[in-house]
């Protein structure tokens, strides 16, 4: 009995492990067939999309052609001597009443016509006015140069001098913060 069971299991394993051709094709060929079916499916999908896109283009082209010709048809149907429809009223056209000028902003009341400004050249830069900070720096430089020229630096009284730059700059820094 054990021997018979081993034989059956051996045959089953052999059949499962060996690729048996089905309908004359091996298992590998069946796999290729499935792959080919997927690529064919993709091809058909792409064809369908391109056909749908082509139909949409034709539809839009036809629609645009109708829009362009509709204006021509509308103007050609109206004869030059035709009367207006009875429900329309002929109101006189008024251009600018006297009340309009009172309520308009200054921008719209300008009498001057618009003048185009000349294009600015990128090379030219506008000189700005020197700021307060620059003026202070210039004063410091002047006092420093005057201080060095007067010979106070060589006298050894640097810390006791009322115009000591290091003391004034320290005081300025403390005042700022």
Swiss-Prot record:
A motif (Nuclear localization signal) lies at residues 108-129. PROSITE patterns: PARATHYROID. It is found in: Secreted; Cytoplasm; Nucleus. Residues 1-24 form the signal peptide. One of its GO terms (biological process) is adenylate cyclase-activating G protein-coupled receptor signaling pathway. There are several secretory forms, including osteostatin, arising from endoproteolytic cleavage of the initial translation product. Each of these secretory forms is believed to have one or more of its own receptors that mediates the normal paracrine, autocrine and endocrine actions. Residues 74-177 are annotated as: Disordered. Residues 109-118 have a biased composition (Basic and acidic residues). Residues 76-90 have a biased composition (Polar residues). Residues 57-68 are annotated as: Important for receptor binding. It holds the Pfam family Parathyroid. Keywords: Calcium, Cleavage on pair of basic residues, Cytoplasm, Hormone, Nucleus, Secreted, Signal. Residues 25-34 form a propeptide. Residues 122-132 have a biased composition (Basic residues). One of its GO terms (molecular function) is hormone activity. It comes from the Eukaryota. One of its GO terms (cellular component) is cytoplasm. PTHrP interacts with PTH1R (via N-terminal extracellular domain). Belongs to the parathyroid hormone family. Neuroendocrine peptide which is a critical regulator of cellular and organ growth, development, migration, differentiation and survival and of epithelial calcium ion transport. Acts by binding to its receptor, PTH1R, activating G protein-coupled receptor signaling. Regulates endochondral bone development and epithelial-mesenchymal interactions during the formation of the mammary glands and teeth. Required for skeletal homeostasis. Promotes mammary mesenchyme differentiation and bud outgrowth by modulating mesenchymal cell responsiveness to BMPs. This is Parathyroid hormone-related protein. It comes from Canis lupus familiaris (Dog). The lineage of its organism: Eukaryota, Metazoa, Chordata, Craniata, Vertebrata. The gene is PTHLH.
């Amino acid at each position: 009995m054990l021997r018979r069971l081993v034989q059956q299991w051996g045959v089953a394993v052999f059949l499962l492990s060996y690729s048996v051709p089905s309908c004359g094709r091996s298992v590998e060929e069946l796999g290729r067939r499935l792959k080919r079916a997927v690529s064919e499916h993709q091809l058909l999908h792409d064809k369908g999309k391109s056909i749908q896109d082509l139909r949409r283009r034709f539809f839009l082209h036809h629609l645009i052609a109708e829009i362009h010709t509709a204006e021509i048809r509308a103007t050609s149907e109206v004869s030059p001597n035709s009367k207006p429809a009875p429900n329309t009223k002929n109101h006189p056209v008024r251009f600018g009443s006297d009340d309009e000028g009172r309520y308009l902003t200054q921008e719209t009341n300008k009498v001057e016509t618009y003048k185009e400004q000349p294009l600015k050249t990128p090379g030219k830069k506008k000189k700005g006015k020197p700021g307060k900070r620059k003026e202070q720096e210039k004063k410091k430089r002047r006092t420093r140069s005057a201080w060095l020229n007067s010979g106070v630096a060589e006298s050894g009284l640097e810390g006791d001098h009322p115009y000591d730059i290091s003391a004034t700059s320290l005081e300025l820094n403390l005042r700022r913060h």
